[in-house]
């Protein structure tokens, strides 16, 4: 972390805010083995960039969403305010949901998928035992109150996908 901080300091970056989280991938990984160590941490820091792989990669490898393959994805928007361009970005790691609850474009799709899976005698997720992580980042010059209002939209997005969220207590 020291090397990263020193490098960023030279680039006039005044803050480094690493995000560490967990989404259970015990379906494919023995989590008690602690296979991620210092070497993997430094490799991840070296790979950090504005362009990055999404889907079934890295932290998204072992995720399951609605009983189907989950992953990691992002979306961002830019806006111009007082002649300056700012970005709002969201990173989501999906690892939740029972297949029967899946909707596509607002229409129930999970039961049809389950029927097909049952015909092929494959496994599926009958119940939701997962989690979801959402990270929102921005360089907008906002107050704490404004930032909290923006962040609350992450919970709304999660709720629209029939999952639960617990916002921090104020």
Predicted regions located by residue number:
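Alpha/propeptide regions of enzymes that mature by internal proteolysis
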Residues: 1-170
